[in-house]
Amino acid sequence: MKKAGLLFLVMIVIAVVAAGIGYWKLTGEESDTLRKIVLEECLPNQQQNQNPSPCAEVKPNAGYVVLKDLNGPLQYLLMPTYRINGTESPLLTDPSTPNFFWLAWQARDFMSKKYGQPVPDRAVSLAINSRTGHTQNHFHIHISCIRPDVREQLDKNLANISSRWLPLPGGLRGHEYLARRVTESELVQRSPFMMLAEEVPEAREHMGSYGLAMVRQSDNSFVLLATQRNLLTLNRASAEEIQDHECEILR
């Protein structure tokens, strides 16, 4: 029994080290691709030629761009027009920073335009990965379809999700998640990053270890989903795992 336990521990350590090495390999020049697209292509083209290309939209005064992602037919990314690395940035808990999740929700219309018909709100999800859960250094929120199994699980737990951050029964995709119900008026007034930092104990000091997602519920409220990095359980806090970029839910 002792040997079996030791072997299990060794396997966990190897997995953790491998995850760390994988992350380290992805922090080179390629990790700046999105930032270069925003700062060196989309923003200058909009300012000089009133053309957002290669982005779908550039809003310099509002501080964001929307870019069609190469992965998936309907996936878009919302990104700032200035340097923000990710969930670890203290700018995200600054009240003067744009409410990027609310802006990303407004940008879901790009999915419908691309699809050629309205994409139901229940099929849409927003997600941002933790510091170790993403491969790009520039802050970006994924706007994409939700996985059908995640949609079903959230529907079943509708009555269990309250206005406080509480563990979601059963978690999602094999990982633990906190869930919080949010009304549209709350979302307009206050960033989900601030809700997480101010309401979850010790979250403010470890924001970079969290992935965050948002989905609309059948009662027109929203549910915020937060997962924290835990390499011992092989959770890199990649909240994007709740999404399906091939959009099976629309078929």
Swiss-Prot record:
Establish whether keyword Lipid biosynthesis is in the entry: yes
Q: What membrane topology does the annotation report for this chain?
A: Single-pass membrane protein
Give a GO biological-process term. CDP-diacylglycerol catabolic process
Which parts pass through the membrane?
4-24
Q: Which family does it belong to?
A: Belongs to the Cdh family.
* Pathway(s) where this gene product acts: Phospholipid metabolism; CDP-diacylglycerol degradation; phosphatidate from CDP-diacylglycerol: step 1/1
Pfam families from the entry? CDH (PF02611)
Q: Which Gene3D superfamilies does the UniProt entry name for this protein?
A: HIT family - CDH-like (3.30.428.30)
What subcellular locations does the record give?
Cell inner membrane
Protein's UniProt keywords contain rRNA-binding: no
Q: Which UniProt keywords apply?
A: Cell inner membrane, Cell membrane, Hydrolase, Lipid biosynthesis, Lipid metabolism, Membrane, Phospholipid biosynthesis, Phospholipid metabolism, Transmembrane, Transmembrane helix
Which Gene Ontology cellular component terms are annotated?
plasma membrane
Return the EC number. Answer: 3.6.1.26
Q: What phylogenetic lineage does the species belong to?
A: Bacteria, Pseudomonadati, Pseudomonadota, Gammaproteobacteria, Enterobacterales
Please name the gene that encodes this protein. Answer: cdh
Q: What is this protein called?
A: CDP-diacylglycerol pyrophosphatase
Q: Which GO terms describe its molecular function?
A: CDP-diacylglycerol diphosphatase activity
The record's catalysed reaction(s) read:
a CDP-1,2-diacyl-sn-glycerol + H2O = a 1,2-diacyl-sn-glycero-3-phosphate + CMP + 2 H(+)
